């Protein structure tokens, strides 16, 4: 059953301005080490950062909190599998909030879709609860 749904649309130019204005301070505040390493290895890193920013916003919406209730930007991270497929990993308060959404004896699956077409980056997150066993 679906227990959470979120989406977000980000203007890549806005993220570019944040990168120029705040640089490493912005990157360190918002993105995990894995996200930074992945984005810095790409030619169009502003698009990569924008997609990850949108994914975090969409995930926070799917959790039902937005960026609030003690959830930190780094509590949500986009990781790419060896196939390239992006997945969302939650830690700390985001993981706690996820557990609150689940009925007893259910596990969560977080579905993530991210895309960009300049000047837009977009993300969708669906949180699904599946019975154990």
From Swiss-Prot:
Protein name (database record): Holo-[acyl-carrier-protein] synthase
Gene Ontology biological process terms in this record: fatty acid biosynthetic process
HAMAP family for this protein: AcpS
Top EC group: transferase
Function: Transfers the 4'-phosphopantetheine moiety from coenzyme A to a Ser of acyl-carrier-protein.
Species for this entry: Bartonella tribocorum (strain CIP 105476 / IBS 506)
Cofactors, names only: Mg(2+)
Residues reported to bind Mg(2+): 8, 57
Family: Belongs to the P-Pant transferase superfamily. AcpS family.
Keywords: Cytoplasm, Fatty acid biosynthesis, Fatty acid metabolism, Lipid biosynthesis, Lipid metabolism, Magnesium, Metal-binding, Transferase
EC number: 2.7.8.7
SUPFAM superfamilies xrefs: 4'-phosphopantetheinyl transferase
Gene Ontology CC terms: cytoplasm
Lineage: Bacteria, Pseudomonadati, Pseudomonadota, Alphaproteobacteria, Hyphomicrobiales
Domain of life, source organism: Bacteria
